[in-house]
């Protein structure tokens, strides 16, 4: 009985250590700030620093995710995507998914 309690305690302790980092890493709103998306696309996803930059607020989640993947891989290398290419190596697949989900919830 003691071994089971000990194993349970160790497992729960591990969850309390790992879980906050996982949740934080997948927080799309926080990532939008820390990965500097807001610098070019604006805090609201609509107020861009240049008129030619896309307004991304409310964009379809699947579309946004695919665009992020294409920019990262180099499959999309037209227009302003070259500016993002230098940043995308810092964004994991999981973070891209969280960002796409967050952007889709922004008011267009």
Where are these regions (language model features)?
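Bacterial N-terminal signal peptides that target proteins for export
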Residues: 2-11
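Electrostatic cytochrome c docking/interface patches
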Residues: 16-33, 47-52
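N-terminal (or domain-start) structured segment
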Residues: 34-35, 80
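Short pre-active-site segment immediately N-terminal to redox-active cysteine/selenocysteine motifs
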Residues: 35-36, 44, 60, 95
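The canonical Cys-X-X-Cys-His
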Residues: 36-43, 99, 103
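Axial heme c-ligation environment in periplasmic c-type cytochrome domains
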Residues: 49-57, 72-106
